[in-house]
Amino acid sequence: MRGIRFASISTTLLSQVDASTGGKNGVNLGKIKNILGCFRQPEFVICDTEMLKTLPDEEYYSGLAELIKTAVIGSERLFELIENNAENIIKRNTSIITMLVSMAVNFKASVVSEDEKESGTRRILNFGHTYGHAIELYKSVRHGYAVASGM
């Protein structure tokens, strides 16, 4: 197989719940999002939720949008846990966040394993992204905020 083997070492909540899993890799060019890209799974993924304590609030909250998106599209249990643990999530309680990240990653991995190249069921993961990408690029807002607006 051609390409470069890589690992995903995710240090933001957004990366942990979204970009770390799925194998969609892209590069923006000017105002065009993900114009160059490929599908390739990382050799392994590390999601160290302790790192999330170092993030500025704006970056952390951006990741929460992707976490909520995952709950909305596929996991009533995840949604309930987010709803019932809002205070601990805001406080970045590591045990709660670790559980939520794990649930989100497992959900996404299950979807991707059925449709790696995004020809059918995987498209559900794009919820919020259709308008979100346009908002993100033209209004210069963080990805998570744009996805939240797109939802």
List PLM regions with ranges.
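A glycine/threonine-rich phosphate-anchoring loop and its flanking beta-alpha core
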Residues: 1-85
